[in-house]
């Protein structure tokens, strides 16, 4: 969505009534090229990451935008702080479907994602590690130098 539209949505609804989700398909993130997909047939992943019907680039064949890009975009588009943007992508969707939302407190499951925030608008949020039940299941935990 264009930046002005996102900004209008957030202003009109307020952050209390907004959530961030992604419907990214399984082929997203694959290198550019042509692939066979059992759901839609032959697809093509373009250099810019878009997923289209092979030979018909005007027809999208699935979403390719990761939630990390959505977080960075809403921060820029709606002039939102990081804590609020992450909340819209984690706590709010969980609450909306009645799922237990995570918390940093004694006895709570140690499930979280460690990421780096871009220093410029051109950079992407980078996932450094995913921790599930206190175990690193993706990446490596980064520890700052003391």
Name every feature range the model reports, one short phrase each.
Residues 1-3:
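Glycine-rich anion/phosphate-binding loop at the beta-strand->alpha-helix junction
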Residues 100-146:
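C-terminal cap of metal-dependent C-N hydrolases
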Residues 5-115:
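His/Asp/Glu-enriched, well-ordered alpha-helical/loop segment
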């Amino acid at each position: 969505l264009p930046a002005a539209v996102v900004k209008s949505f957030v202003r009109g609804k307020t952050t209390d009534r907004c959530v961030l989700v992604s419907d990214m398909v399984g082929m997203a993130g694959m290198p550019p090229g042509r692939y066979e997909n059992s759901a839609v047939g032959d697809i093509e992943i373009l250099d810019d990451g878009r997923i289209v019907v092979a030979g018909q680039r005007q027809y999208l064949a699935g979403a390719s935008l990761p939630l990390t890009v959505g977080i960075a975009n809403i921060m820029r588009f709606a002039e939102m702080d990081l804590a609020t943007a992450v909340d819209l992508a984690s706590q709010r969707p969980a609450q909306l479907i009645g799922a237990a939302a995570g918390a940093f407190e004694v006895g709570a499951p140690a499930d979280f994602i460690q990421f780096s925030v871009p220093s410029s608008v051109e950079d992407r949020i980078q996932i450094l590690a995913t921790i599930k039940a206190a175990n690193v299941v993706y990446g490596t935990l980064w520890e700052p130098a003391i």
